[in-house]
Design a protein with these regions (language model features):
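ABC ATPase NBD coupling module
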Residues: 68-83, 228
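Conserved ABC transporter NBD signature motif
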Residues: 60-67, 114
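Q-loop/switch helix immediately C-terminal to the Walker
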Residues: 88, 94-111
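Conserved structural motif at the start of ABC-family nucleotide-binding domains
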Residues: 2, 19-23
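The feature captures the beta-strand-to-loop junction immediately N-terminal to the Walker
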Residues: 37-39
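Walker B catalytic motif
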Residues: 163-164, 171
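Helix-to-loop junction immediately C-terminal to a conserved catalytic motif
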Residues: 52
Length: 246
């Protein structure tokens, strides 16, 4: 279980202090699929980075399975089973996709077939990618899918995905949502997905709308989705439909 208690994040700007995250408290039970959504600049990514340890909060406490992890490093959190997928994943010149999957799996010895299976789950033809370097020759969407495959290979207990649909074509997007659904059905991990996409939002056990650094709405899909649509129709583009996705 993940517990955020009165999390705040403040930065200094030329105009003075600015609160990016304002006293957010939320508990996420094990094996839930949570979607964080809301307007751009509302604080979703910052909150996710705080959970992973990429950003240190200026106030509050983070508990994971009852342990205070607020001061732990990224590496220490990763060892506890927390994984993070970036909006814009890094590239690794000289490291092949196969190498990256083996590194992600850690002590688990992945067979070539297992590596191929992870790539297939994110909509990539394994034979075309396994021996390619994760460098500038790959598109942003390709690197994004490879990163998601490495997260799957880690078998983390808490998986955080920041806009996993970004730069991904419709066919691969469909495969990706199927993968999220399967992980959720298996009940092996808690997922936090930052997304504006209707199809991903509707997978959620709970939707959390974050705006202006605060939780604006939280509840089931049936409760919150109509509010998102109302905001959208009212001129606040909280939700974007992925054209062609059904």
């Amino acid at each position: 279980m993940l517990e955020l208690k009165h999390i705040s994040y403040r930065v200094s700007t030329p105009e003075g202090e600015m609160d990016i995250i304002k006293d957010i408290s939320i508990t996420i039970p094990d094996h839930r699929l949570m979607v964080f959504t809301g307007p751009n600049g509302g604080g979703k990514t910052t909150l996710a980075k705080i959970i992973m340890g990429l950003v240190q909060p200026t106030g509050g406490q983070i508990l994971y399975n009852g342990e205070d992890i607020t001061g732990l490093s990224i590496t220490e959190r990763a060892k506890k089973g927390i994984s993070y997928g970036f909006q814009q994943p890094p590239r690794f010149k000289g490291i092949t996709v196969h190498d990256l999957l083996l590194l992600a799996a850690g002590e688990e010895k992945l067979s070539k077939d297992r590596c191929c299976a992870y790539l297939t789950k994110v909509g990539l033809c394994a034979n075309d990618y396994l021996d390619r370097e994760v460098d500038v020759s790959l598109s942003g969407g390709e690197v994004k899918r490879i990163e998601i495959a490495t997260i799957l290979a880690r078998h983390g207990e808490l998986m955080i995905f920041d806009e996993p649909e970004a730069g991904i074509d419709l066919w691969s997007f469909a495969r990706l949502t199927e993968t999220f659904e399967q992980i959720h059905r298996d009940g092996t991990a808690t997922m936090i997905i930052i997304s504006h996409q209707e199809r991903i939002i509707k997978l959620a056990d709970e939707i959390v709308v974050i705006a202006n650094g605060q939780i604006a709405h939280r509840g089931s899909t049936d409760e919150v989705f109509p509010l998102i649509l109302a905001d959208t129709l009212g001129g606040c583009p909280v939700l974007e439909r992925k054209e062609g996705a059904q």
